[in-house]
Amino acid sequence: MTLLCRPAILSRCLPLCREIPNPRKGDPAMRKALKILLVLLLTVLVLAAAYVAYVFLAYYRIEDQQVLTVEGSVTETLRPGQTCRAISYNIGFGAYESDYSFFLDGGTQSWAWSEERLRENLDEIAALLQAENADFLLLQEVDVDATRTYHFDESAVLRAAFPDRACVYAQNYDSPFLLYPFTQPHGASRAGMLTFSRYAVSSSLRRSLPIEGGFRKFLDLDRCYSVCRLPVEGGKELVLYTLHLSAYSADGSISVEQLKLLLADMQAEYEKGNYSVAGGDFNKDLLGNSAQWFGAADREYTWAQPLPEDIFDGTGISLAAPLDEKNPVPSCRNADAPYHEGQYVLTVDGFLVSGNVTVEEAAVLDTGFAHSDHNPVSLTFTLNAG
């Protein structure tokens, strides 16, 4: 079929064709706006790529078997048959007061409330530990220079509180600047673990722990445990370990691998005839099922799994989980909200001992989570003679 273009039809179509805009002759203001938008988008992409490169380039891990400095001039030595007391306390970088929630746990805060409140809380933590007067202090999450704690050296406060103790610092966190949350970036953090001893420490070592690979390694600490060697009369040693195992992992298996490495070290010392005691934050449900003791069971919280039942088989090492069955107190609260009645709580802090160490008591010190998302835990133990 042949279509004939009549003059009347053409006269109607031509004005419409003239109204179709030519993209090459667009509105100057529109072209300028598009250019600005493209420049902004390109700038954002370049900055994002530069930040990712910075995070990757800044990442490093401290080598295994790092020799640690033992501070202080303590000379008193232990003896077989002696009873001692140790306290382990994750101080939550001094920020986790009872009204605090942390953004990585689903809460709101990324910094301590204020530098003034931070210093007051640290003074109260130091006073609490002084009043307990334990022989050994095993402390985790101690900031030495961090955006989140106003670049205040928390270790200086704790060292000043125990000037007559031997002291060992082991770094396990040195993160690049974290830009999130955007309203108050978490920033850069350098932190670690402190060990204080009333008795002489002859040497100390830092053991690096395995961590997850891929992107998750940027979310985890540079996990480790410190090893302090204390002479005991008669030629033996007390080998004291301070630890903080992984929490933010895909399925919790990496912390089991970390624990196996620690157990192998402790077993080797025990087989030499030395005493082995370890304490810290395991990030595992050390009671197996904390909900049966404290209630508030919630399947949403799966970050702290029970330890494998057979993990201690053949090691000569046993778990000393702090529990008073008549008055059970948890050692940790979930930090997705300020502390409140019915909040998810459990026990993740505790101790390991070798077969030649008798556990007299393992207990949680009930602070009501006033200073941290953890309560301190204590172990009274005896170094068996013979």
Go through the PLM ranges and name each one:
Residues 216-217, 337-342, 366-371:
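Short proline/glycine-enriched turn/loop segments at secondary-structure junctions
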